Amino acid sequence: MGHGRRISESIKKQLPVTGPEAPTVKNLMDWYLNNTNTHGCRRIAVSRGYLRRWIWICFTVSSVGMIFWQWTLLLMSYYTVSVSVTVQFQTLPFPAVTICNINPYRKNATSALLEELDKQTKLILKELYTSCTGCSNRKLRSVLLNEAPEEDSGVAKLLQDMPLMKFEVIKEDHVIVSELSSNRQYRINNTFITRMYNNMDLATVGEQVGFKICDANKSNCIIYTFNSGVTAILEWYRLNYLNIMAQIPNEKKLEMGYSADDLIVTCMYDGQSCDSRNFTLFQHPLHGNCYTFNSGDDGNILQTLTGGSEYGLKLTLYLENDDYNPYLFTSMGAKIIVHDQTEYPLVDDVGLEIQTATETLIGLQVTTSAKLSKPYSDCTMDGSDVLEQNLYNTSYSLQICLHSCFQTEMISNCGCAYYEQPLPSGAEYCYYEKYPGWIYCYYQLQDKFVNERLACQDICKETCNSKDWDLTKSLARWPSVASKDWVLNLLNWERGLNNTLNKNDLASIAIFYQDLNLRSLSESPANSIATLLSNMGGQLGLWMSCSIVCFLEMWEVFLVDILTIIARYWLHRGRQWWRKRKERQMQQPSPPDHDTGHHNPVCIDDEDPPTFHTAMQLPCVQTGPVPSTPPPQYNALRIQSVFDEQVSDTEVN
């Protein structure tokens, strides 16, 4: 007890509560502010001037407020142990579904246009049947020629200039080729082989089938050979077909194609009936009249409330097997593409083929992707920063950009547009009568495009935001053996076909959401600005006990104070220079006035020797400094000495 009393008395003695030596709150705050390690509080005490002091007070109070706010959030998050579960039933927009018949036009509508082409194709096939049975696999090649044989004038010009050929005799230094339509033969010398498009060794050339194409001047020609006669004929027929269709106006092609009522037999959506009025026409260059369900052109997009095969879109298509062109496509059925309402249906790129006599179930799962743009990736948000015109007038995509770029290069290099892609304003599609070298130019450009020697792959970018549908396809025979008779009889009666309908003319399709889960893939930066500042602040606090207030102190000292000192120094130097300049101007004498001559009657400078005239003039006033007169030296008069001497003389006398 005595020891505690002694400590209490010592404290009262050293820290009196009353009296003149008792500390006040102001003294305590001054001591704290001058000795604390809290940077902002110390700056309040040592700052000079009320403005700086109030600025530091505001910074410090704001920092304290941020600390308490963050602490409150952290404590609330730490002590919150409740769990909430939210269940929502959402609807998903049903995608647009575009349906095309693989066969683009009715056979009776194109028979007159394709008569000569079909005739030549049959003759070529007959020749191949008798001479090319059992052909082995071959590689894709092309051979450069510089001369062509004489052509018959009884066939179309393109069929003359682009004949199908077969390699006959192979020697060490040349190859003999024959035209399948005319049986004419000519040889390709080894000198021409060295200039070929993709060089090939003559020793490896077997019996090949290909066709010849030339430029507009026929100075350079190429024979393309294929690994199969079927592939060669399909490609040769397709080029001739495109050449013919490029000259047909869209109005006539619309009449030649299938109508929505011809193509669509039955339609159901979410258990409700639909018909051709719910479809929008879409003209495709290769597949003719296509039709889009839920296109959104009227401003309404259908929503799906329930997933499963019992819902969604169900269709029965009539594809008319006997109406197919046997040389244009070797497959039969329909092409379907699922896409967003703002996207262009690229049928040939991502279209799904549906076969006849089959029920096809297509389950959908939608996934949205969001990628980070620069500097994390070189993607584009909407294509506005891509230096390529969108010829499809739809939302941007990488494929749309590549096709548009190729069409632009085609017009720039070949002078005309490729038929399978949109036609830009002011251009026209290529056809042989007006552009005889377009096929040669197209293959040259296609080779550059495939080998990425065009600028398209550098110009076009991927999209940052995209929506993709994952398709799950399942097949079943349709109609079944048990239901075949009544289904076909009923459809024959509805369409008035007099029992000519068979199951190979029909295809059943069901497109539905497997579930209504929307999958989202998004990118986030691994190191954000907040993470960077947090890590840097942690290192500064760990090793230097520094915070953002330290940077404010540095900003005040090294920026504000140093700039103030520098400005004050140069201002002082400027004032000194100006003061010295004024002093030099005040000390500098004024220049003398030297007005002389006969016109000056007042004064004239001295002449040597003087004349009478100058002697009568006044001398010029001296403008220089007047010499000072020294004070008289009175002792030089020696008056007293003179008087003394006189007195002395008198006295002597």
UniProtKB/Swiss-Prot annotation:
<keyword id="KW-0813">Transport</keyword>
<keyword id="KW-0739">Sodium transport</keyword>
<keyword id="KW-0472">Membrane</keyword>
<feature type="disulfide bond">
    <location>
        <begin position="416"/>
        <end position="430"/>
    </location>
</feature>
<feature type="region of interest" description="Disordered">
    <location>
        <begin position="582"/>
        <end position="608"/>
    </location>
</feature>
<comment type="similarity">
    <text>Belongs to the amiloride-sensitive sodium channel (TC 1.A.6) family. SCNN1G subfamily.</text>
</comment>
<dbReference type="GO" id="GO:0034706">
    <property type="term" value="C:sodium channel complex"/>
</dbReference>
<feature type="transmembrane region" description="Helical; Name=2">
    <location>
        <begin position="547"/>
        <end position="567"/>
    </location>
</feature>
<keyword id="KW-0812">Transmembrane</keyword>
<feature type="disulfide bond">
    <location>
        <begin position="267"/>
        <end position="274"/>
    </location>
</feature>
<dbReference type="InterPro" id="IPR020903">
    <property type="entry name" value="ENaC_CS"/>
</dbReference>
<dbReference type="GO" id="GO:0016324">
    <property type="term" value="C:apical plasma membrane"/>
</dbReference>
<keyword id="KW-1133">Transmembrane helix</keyword>
<feature type="transmembrane region" description="Helical; Name=1">
    <location>
        <begin position="55"/>
        <end position="75"/>
    </location>
</feature>
<feature type="disulfide bond">
    <location>
        <begin position="401"/>
        <end position="460"/>
    </location>
</feature>
<feature type="disulfide bond">
    <location>
        <begin position="379"/>
        <end position="464"/>
    </location>
</feature>
<keyword id="KW-1015">Disulfide bond</keyword>
<dbReference type="GO" id="GO:0035725">
    <property type="term" value="P:sodium ion transmembrane transport"/>
</dbReference>
<comment type="subunit">
    <text>Component of the heterotrimeric epithelial sodium channel (ENaC) composed of an alpha/SCNN1A, a beta/SCNN1B and a gamma/SCNN1G subunit.</text>
</comment>
<dbReference type="Pfam" id="PF00858">
    <property type="entry name" value="ASC"/>
</dbReference>
<dbReference type="GO" id="GO:0015280">
    <property type="term" value="F:ligand-gated sodium channel activity"/>
</dbReference>
<feature type="topological domain" description="Cytoplasmic">
    <location>
        <begin position="1"/>
        <end position="54"/>
    </location>
</feature>
<dbReference type="InterPro" id="IPR001873">
    <property type="entry name" value="ENaC"/>
</dbReference>
<feature type="topological domain" description="Cytoplasmic">
    <location>
        <begin position="568"/>
        <end position="653"/>
    </location>
</feature>
<keyword id="KW-1003">Cell membrane</keyword>
<feature type="disulfide bond">
    <location>
        <begin position="100"/>
        <end position="290"/>
    </location>
</feature>
<keyword id="KW-0915">Sodium</keyword>
<keyword id="KW-0406">Ion transport</keyword>
<feature type="disulfide bond">
    <location>
        <begin position="405"/>
        <end position="456"/>
    </location>
</feature>
<dbReference type="InterPro" id="IPR004724">
    <property type="entry name" value="ENaC_chordates"/>
</dbReference>
<feature type="disulfide bond">
    <location>
        <begin position="414"/>
        <end position="441"/>
    </location>
</feature>
<keyword id="KW-0894">Sodium channel</keyword>
<keyword id="KW-0407">Ion channel</keyword>
<comment type="function">
    <text>This is one of the three pore-forming subunits of the heterotrimeric epithelial sodium channel (ENaC), a critical regulator of sodium balance and fluid homeostasis. ENaC operates in epithelial tissues, where it mediates the electrodiffusion of sodium ions from extracellular fluid through the apical membrane of cells, with water following osmotically.</text>
</comment>
<feature type="topological domain" description="Extracellular">
    <location>
        <begin position="76"/>
        <end position="546"/>
    </location>
</feature>
<feature type="disulfide bond">
    <location>
        <begin position="214"/>
        <end position="221"/>
    </location>
</feature>
<protein>
    <recommendedName>
        <fullName>Epithelial sodium channel subunit gamma</fullName>
    </recommendedName>
</protein>
